[in-house]
Amino acid sequence: MTSPAIPDLLYSDVEDDLRAAVRAVLADRCGHAAVLGRIESAEPYDPALWRLLAAELGLAGLLVPEKLGGQGASAREAAVVLEELGGAVAPVPFLGSAVLATTALLGCDTADPATAALLGRLAAGEARAALAVPLSAAPGDGFPATVRADAGGRLTGAVTSVADALTAGVLVVPALGPEGPGLYEVAAAQAASERPVSLDLTRPLADLRFDAAAGRLLAGGDSAVAALERALLTGAGLLASEQLGLAQWCLDETVRYLGQRRQFGRVVGSFQALKHRLADLWLDVVSARAAARNAAGVLAAWPSDPAEVSLAVALAQAYVSPVAVRAAEEAVQLHGGIGMTWEHPVHLYLKRAKADEIALGTPGRHRRALAVPVDLPPAA
């Protein structure tokens, strides 16, 4: 038995260059005033920003192989992008389209001309897709059974709380057919959608209903189950990088604010009690970075030991998710009264952190997964 390779947690020059490019675009096109304006409008997503990121920077096709029209990058590069998107709470469908839906499609038969063409359109930014599962779906939950397919590929059923479905033109739908599990391509126009009230207004959800919607079978049987599981594992592992970027922004912004704010005749950040809180938070964020980078590295090495992938993803989510929430809560509190206002962007980060906490498996769900390999009894 060979020992697992030591993970490379450092960023490469290519990853640093990618970060700089994404950060420059977000600084120019995704300021907090613009994000607040978006969520107050009828169209919370920013289509112009997405076109710039997806087509001009090629981010929509990061995970798509070059032979299918993508960039042929890995989960490590996608993780860097998600760090920056999380740090800006950018209202774009990268997680839903470029990660979840794309990874599910890559687990299907990419030699099929129609599937290859769809991946090419997604990679070019010409189309957007969403994986039709609840955002709370976690790796290892089993194949969903809320949608049924008949022998002709027509789908009937409902899926609630689907991320990035409102902006998608194509839905990748898990459904149970006459021969068992299957993944189906369905035009978004074939589904009735409603937008429920969601905590995170920068990533609105959709409730979808299918009534004999025409679908094309992408994968069936074990292939469909494996493709869905891989998509959820990849999504959960890379979500940790979004949460990391969010936590880093909260820490940096709070340090900056406390270094400027004066009270009682001195800079607020000079008080020892606040220094200790920020130092503790810094340690949490540094540890979260290690967990998120490890998950991205293991995912980038896929196919590797499935148990190693599951372990790295569960560890990242179990640790990083609470850190992101704590960082956002500390940012709100340490900003004082201004942190409670709508005009200050810190509430966007708290809402995203709380929404991400239940996305793709709660921390408790992932801790239970971690308990299995070390034979810990389940919590009472």
Give names to the regions the model predicted.
Residues 3, 116-248, 252:
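FAD-binding core of flavoproteins
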Residues 92-112:
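N-terminal glycine-rich flavin-associated loop
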Residues 32, 115-116:
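Short amphipathic alpha-helical segments that mediate assembly, nucleic-acid/protein binding
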Residues 46, 111-115, 224:
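Amphipathic coiled-coil/heptad-repeat helices and related helical stalk/stem segments
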Residues 1-86, 233-380:
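Alpha-helical interface subdomain recognition
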Residues 80, 84, 100-107, 117, ...:
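Generic beta-strand or strand-like secondary-structure segments
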Residues 74-78, 98, 115:
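Amphipathic alpha-helical segments in well-structured domains
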